[in-house]
């Protein structure tokens, strides 16, 4: 059933399926306590250091996961010859570009970690540099920022040892200035009980965890703001796991909610009780 969904669903749903698979591995590999002093080294988001071997073992065991793996590598090869993402707005949104960047950087970074073929890391780096040089990520529609920060954070974290110091600096500055700094303390999504809360909080959390050692005070504020405001989104699942926005937005919001929780667990340990929220 899973492989059917992956092979025949739309690209964004394919990405969500992969994210759920890797979120599962982060649960298996996570530490045991929420303590900033015990922040894991890079890579710390979802697939931690050495986690590739667990994925490879599963690929060798389960044919459905092998097909997903092969599909990602095939799409990564196709990305290598495609034009770089451009900052082209659709009405008031940049969301399509953010999602394209997330898919490309995520797939390419995964392909590099699983194969060690430099062509994937090189192209992922070029994608990250390209969007890092955008003037902004359209903070007036903050979903665009949330997904773009997630894209850059995964690439920065997963390719950390590959990236040149200058490249790290450019990408890190973009995550901070166009992501973390773009979120005002009173942003409305912090008060929302909808997919916006999970998506925007999730993206910002990934950014904070990715660059934590360079801006610890700022990162802690983002993390703690997330822990304070994210339960509003979890309450929307009550009383029986339904979702007031319907099944489509249930899938969108829940995928980012799972990613949010998995990032806390893979980077720090427990998730501060988010996964135990009564209605979630």
Outline where the language-model segments fall:
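Beta-rich carbohydrate-recognition and catalytic domains
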Residues: 41
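Sec-dependent signal peptide hydrophobic core
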Residues: 17-22
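Positively charged, low-complexity intrinsically disordered regions
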Residues: 13-16, 45
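N-terminal signal peptide c-region/cleavage motif recognized by signal peptidases
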Residues: 26-30
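Aromatic-lined, polymer-binding surfaces characteristic
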Residues: 44-59, 65-280
């Amino acid at each position: 059933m899973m492989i059917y969904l992956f092979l025949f669903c739309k690209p964004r749903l394919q990405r969500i399926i992969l994210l759920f698979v890797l979120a599962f591995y982060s649960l298996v590999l996570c530490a045991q306590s929420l303590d900033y002093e015990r922040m894991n080294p890079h890579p710390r988001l979802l697939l931690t250091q050495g986690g590739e071997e667990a994925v490879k073992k599963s690929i060798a065991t389960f044919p459905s996961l092998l097909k997903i793996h092969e599909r990602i590598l095939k799409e990564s090869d196709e990305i290598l010859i495609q034009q770089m993402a451009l900052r082209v707005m659709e009405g008031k949104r940049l969301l399509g570009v953010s999602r394209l960047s997330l898919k490309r950087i995520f797939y390419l970074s995964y392909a590099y970690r699983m194969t060690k073929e430099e062509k994937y890391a090189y192209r992922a780096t070029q994608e990250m540099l390209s969007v890092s040089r955008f003037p902004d990520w359209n903070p007036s529609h903050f979903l665009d920022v949330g997904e773009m920060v997630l894209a850059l954070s995964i690439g920065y974290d997963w390719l950390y040892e590959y990236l040149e110091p200058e490249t790290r600096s450019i990408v890190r500055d973009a995550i901070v200035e166009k992501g973390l700094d773009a979120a005002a303390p009173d942003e409305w999504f912090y008060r929302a009980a909808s997919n916006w809360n999970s998506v925007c909080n999730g993206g910002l959390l990934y950014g904070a965890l990715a660059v934590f050692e360079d801006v610890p005070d700022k990162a802690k504020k983002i993390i703690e703001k997330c822990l304070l405001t994210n339960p509003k989104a979890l309450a929307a699942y009550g009383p029986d796991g339904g979702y007031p926005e319907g099944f489509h937005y249930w899938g969108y919001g829940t995928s980012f909610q799972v990613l949010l929780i998995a990032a806390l667990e893979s980077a720090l340990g427990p998730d501060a009780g988010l996964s135990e929220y009564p209605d979630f």
